[in-house]
């Protein structure tokens, strides 16, 4: 699955794209780097990854309580217990991340405005380059208030054996993306459909210590060629920080078929929450009506038939969506304005 150390978010949750499930960061690769450094006498590497491991896992290296049990024969083949140097202090998570990072080998880009566990914001963008990928175009996840607010659907409940994986979870409508004329798709699993990074601020970089390293504004602009409909798509995303505890996202998605004849460009967005209200931006009622327009029977992807409780309205006004995430302490209300 498309996960890695660089995908860590504030609560050490991994970013999700392709065949993933939401989960916490696995520190085994960090342990392997420490063991490699100890065997080969790489002191600088050992110090770097030991500090990282102690940052991610404060209990790392602490001796486990001895148990009065028989010694397993597997102990002859297991790795020796990891011993960490006590003089190496835990690093700070800010030392291992950057405001913007782009990994073209998997067509993945992340941008953030800090690492505060509650108030910082982050955007994750991905296309489909490599193995275990989905047909998702320029897909995104949004992070805020310490949660994955706009999650990627991942692999689904029944993994590869389920029909829902082939028809829905691996297809455009299950992702936060734009589907053209209801037909956007391409081969999944091993895929070679990446996006091009046109421009960004700040420049993509590995972590580097710097004063005021998180600017008040970050942005990225990427291009993707959707092969099924022969559409050119660009997505410009930005995080604007307005205060120590406040900020907002900007998402400008442009989509146009090369030869014209555009019918519809469906903007899909999935947010956490138990409730959602949809009104005009000025608060007036849109008079939503039930519809079955978005369905497989309309010559669209089968994934459209997985949508339920569908409603529609025709309007020339800006639209406002308010999601309610009910929490034990304080509810979260993501607001989205569609212009």
What residue ranges belong to the model's regions?
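Acidic Ser/Thr-enriched surface turn/capping motif at secondary-structure junctions
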Residues: 10-35
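Polysaccharide-binding surfaces and accessory modules of carbohydrate-active proteins
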Residues: 268-338
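Flexible domain-boundary/linker segments
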Residues: 13-14, 20-21, 163, 195, ...
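Short, small-residue-biased leader/transition segments that mark boundaries at the very start
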Residues: 1, 5-9
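Catalytic and substrate-binding regions of extracellular carbohydrate-active enzymes
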Residues: 38-39, 46-292
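Short linear sequence elements within intrinsically disordered, low-complexity coil regions
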Residues: 22, 53-54, 81-82, 200, ...
